[in-house]
Amino acid sequence: MSLLSRTFQLATHLVPSQRTFSTTLGMTEKATFAAGCFWGVEHMYNKYFKKDGITTKVGYIGGKVDNPTYKQVCSGATDHAEALEITFDPKRVEYAKLVEFFYNMHDPTTLNAQGPDRGTQYRSAIFYHSPEQKEIAEKVTAEVQEKHYKGKKIVTEIVPAGVFYDAETYHQLYLEKNPSGYECPSHFLRW
């Protein structure tokens, strides 16, 4: 058995399942956030965290239909949220920092809406991939509620990550590929 095989076996045996073994022998984790239109969410995370080595993809999570299409999700009938899945190296960027940024770049006090976008597919949600992520998300949420949203209630759902379905190819990195097109008016830094 090669050293790489033994290392992989050891790494996958000792770490929680939400972590994956990268080709650079480092561990990566996933973070999944819903905060309105996924184009704007992806654009904001890439703008501020690409330098930290994150990779992103947009898709659908939290619904009751397998392999939903954009049209189905937009109808509101599938219960999916438009979401961003981030793969990150926790040695380069901490999960807590990604969660705090999530609250900074959208309005977590509006139920099933962000700016002009309305419907459950635009809800504010953190989909955690481990008990540790849940604990961190709850702690950061309480801190942000106290510090930034006194008098307004954060309505963000903190729920287990289920199956994430990749959105259609044309949605991936949409605002990067269409820089003079639509801008998401609800995604900006609030503090």
Predicted regions and their residues:
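Flexible coil/turn and secondary-structure edge motifs
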Residues: 2-191
